[in-house]
């Protein structure tokens, strides 16, 4: 019997690679790396990109990797079939796509820069021009997950509560909205990594400074002005979904520090220690609804806020990609989220992947049996 921490490992894949169903209409896959290490985007994406390359090569695909940072594991010569150390921009990527002619692009394992580049390539018509299919996440799903307006619309349709908020495209608009909501307010720029350019503001002067910075940092010049939920509990779920809409929760993460401390700076525990079973069940039901509506294949990180006084739950945001939390969850549980996500993007389902004592991955539960 293969122990849990070897799920999807080389041993597992080697045992089954000959009879595993996978997509045969794609042969060459382009993976976008995460680029330089900056605050909020570090080695977790090198880890996930390397895992993806390993998994897809084991399944027989040819891998073309593009990354601007040579000081990574994923740019080692043996990780991909072809590796380009090039700037991560649309012009250079078009040249690489024209030369290599990949069948598919896997964007959700290279962090925020991978997702943003995929969106830009799509808008520029390059993916259509060279007939490149996006796997793992649909392009419109990136927008539903990352664009604050689209995400709010999607949540309203699902009947899932969010913090009261409105979108601003200028500092003046943001000032008006903040006056209506009452200070303090949170500013969240769209299409940024780790909340870059945003923050908590307590008065009009702070708002002017932070909002101007946020509008500049946002790929689409859009900032969400949101009611403050300072002091609530911040809770995260790592969900994995396949093409047949089977979903499993890999990990329940409780941030020890309350909302207001960035998740990247907060202590956290997996599994949750002080949250009731009933509350965890509600979180899981809502997370499944969200992941199904966004239709990501592979790992998604869903962040919630819970008011311990009123028991109100609201969704903060989702990351339709491997994230800092998924690297953390992988290490805490022994479940290789990035590796499994890559296999699912290649057309396998959770039922196809063997998993120790559970038999197959669709029966996995995060029982925290250490």
Regions found by a protein language model. Name each.
Residues 1-15:
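Single conserved hydrophobic/aromatic residue that forms the stacking wall/gate
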Residues 9, 20-21, 27, 46, ...:
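ATP-dependent carboxylate activation and anion-phosphoryl transfer catalytic cores
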Residues 182-190:
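Conserved anion/nucleotide-ligand pocket segment
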Residues 133-136, 166-171, 175, 355, ...:
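Internal, active-site/partner-interface "lid" segment
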Residues 164, 185, 223-224:
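A short linear hydrophobic-aromatic micro-motif
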Residues 9, 17-160, 169-176:
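ATP-binding N-terminal substructure of ATP-dependent carboxylate-amine bond-forming enzymes
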Residues 36-39, 141-142, 191-194, 321-325:
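A short, flexible beta-alpha/helix-coil linker loop
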Residues 123, 130, 181, 219-220:
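Accessory helical subdomains and C-terminal extensions of nucleic-acid helicases
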